[in-house]
Every structure is written in C-alpha cells, then in structure tokens.
C-alpha cells in the first residue's frame, strides 16, 4: 500500500527545490509534474508513482491519456484532473504553458485526480 502522505509531506521544501534543479539541469525539455490521487478518492486506484517528467510539447489531453492508461481505466470510467488542486485547464493547453502559470514555488507542477467532481469545478475527460 502506497504511503498516505503527500509528496510535499514526504520531501522537505529544500529537497523538492533541489530535485527540480537537478531535473531541469539534466532534462531541460521536461516538465517536473507530481500527480496524486485526491485524498477522498475511493474508486480510482493509486498510481504506481507520483513524479513524472513530461515533455514540454505534450498537451493536457495527451497527459490525461497517459494517466488513464497507467490507471488501466476503461472508456466509461469518469476521470477528473485538477492542476494545483483547483484549476481547470483546457485539454488543448501545452503542459509548458500550464507549468509557467501554475507551478508551485518549489518548481513542481502539482495535479490531483478523482472519479467525481468532489472538489468543485473539475475537468472531465
């Protein structure tokens, strides 16, 4: 069973800043993204990992397809993805644009997923 602690709870701010610095140095065309299951989610499984390096040209719809595939969801299973726990993002938006406007002060871009709109406005795909 994966840890119940969030990525931010498992790694100090300084560790996360250093992680991003190394990632951006070694992979300048990749966006460091943390994707975690919404804390109240019961239906969707937990991802096998939370840290993703996403090519900067990928748009949100491609990222959603990747996550749905990793979760092994079928076509009729609901899936909502929120950036920073609150922001709806157009599926055609490149991840690089989302990163520029929504990245955390530690340098990571944080997203949560759930099977319902339990947290207000969400993006259904």
Curated annotation (Swiss-Prot):
Q: Which family does it belong to?
A: Belongs to the ATG8 family.
The task this protein performs is described as:
Ubiquitin-like modifier involved in formation of autophagosomal vacuoles (autophagosomes). Plays a role in mitophagy which contributes to regulate mitochondrial quantity and quality by eliminating the mitochondria to a basal level to fulfill cellular energy requirements and preventing excess ROS production.
Does this entry carry the keyword Metal-binding?
Answer: no
Question: CDD domains, per this entry?
Answer: Ubl_ATG8_MAP1LC3B
Please list the residues that make up the propeptide.
Answer: 121-125
- Compartment(s): Cytoplasmic vesicle, Autophagosome membrane; Endomembrane system; Mitochondrion membrane; Cytoplasm, Cytoskeleton
Can you supply a Gene Ontology BP term from the record?
establishment of localization in cell
Chief subcellular location: membrane
Q: What is this protein called?
A: Microtubule-associated protein 1 light chain 3 beta
Keywords (alphabetical) are:
Autophagy, Cytoplasm, Cytoplasmic vesicle, Cytoskeleton, Lipoprotein, Membrane, Microtubule, Mitochondrion, Phosphoprotein, Ubl conjugation, Ubl conjugation pathway
Instruction: Check the record and name the Gene3D superfamilies matching this protein.
Output: Phosphatidylinositol 3-kinase Catalytic Subunit, Chain A, domain 1 (3.10.20.90)
> Subunit composition?
3 different light chains, LC1 (a cleavage product of MAP1B), LC2 (a cleavage product of MAP1A) and LC3 (produced by one of the MAP1LC3 genes), can associate with the MAP1A or MAP1B heavy chains. Interacts at microtubules with CABP1 (via EF-hands 1 and 2) but not with calmodulin. Interacts with FYCO1 (via C-terminus). Interacts with TP53INP1 and TP53INP2. Interacts with TBC1D25. Directly interacts with SQSTM1; this interaction leads to MAP1LC3B recruitment to inclusion bodies containing polyubiquitinated protein aggregates and to inclusion body degradation by autophagy.
Q: How does it sit in the membrane?
A: Lipid-anchor
Q: Where is the lipid attached (Phosphatidylserine amidated glycine)?
A: 120
User: Where in the sequence is the signal peptide annotated?
Assistant: none
Q: Which organism is it from?
A: Mus musculus
């Amino acid at each position: 069973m994966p840890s119940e602690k969030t990525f931010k709870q498992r790694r100090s701010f300084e560790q996360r800043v250093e992680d991003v610095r190394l990632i951006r140095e070694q992979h300048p065309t990749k966006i460091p993204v943390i994707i975690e299951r919404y804390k109240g989610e019961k239906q969707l499984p937990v991802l096998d990992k939370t840290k993703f390096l996403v090519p900067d040209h990928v748009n949100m719809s491609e990222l959603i397809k990747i996550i749905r595939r990793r979760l092994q969801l079928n076509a009729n299973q609901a899936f909502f993805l929120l950036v920073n726990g609150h922001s709806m993002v157009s599926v055609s938006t490149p991840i690089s644009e989302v990163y520029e406007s929504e990245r955390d002060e530690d340098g990571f871009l944080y997203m949560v997923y759930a099977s319902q709109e339990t947290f207000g406005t969400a993006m259904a795909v």
